[in-house]
């Protein structure tokens, strides 16, 4: 299977984000560094109070908890309470800080870039805007990238869903 087009929201390439870590990024994305700690500490702390963990991560962004419907929050909490969920989340973040970085660097060293059209959008009030040149970073690892800043924080889909659809749908539906 092949990815034909990709929309990325409020993210820079992971290798660039780790290499460019500064105080502002570390404070905003503290959970990245918490989740990569060895088992079982992060899992135990998350599982002890999933609702508080969600509020600590999601509520710490510029919009707080306001963008999230109560039903959506309840579903996040339900899923985070399921056995194995915290382990899976931590495993994903641990991989992003280890083997994924090795693979990303190997691709860069080999001159391998993403070739599908990419549209990256990030929030004007978020850490990506404050800490990275997202468009430039994606252009280093992909051949066809467009991007823009949107009037929101990190949770683009929840904060400005109509604007996101107006931006993403024409791009995704463009047959070339």
Predicted segments, located by residue:
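Flexible "cap/lid" subdomain of the alpha/beta-hydrolase fold that forms the substrate-access gate
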Residues: 2-149, 157, 169-176
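Catalytic histidine-centered segment of alpha/beta-hydrolase-like enzymes
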Residues: 152-165
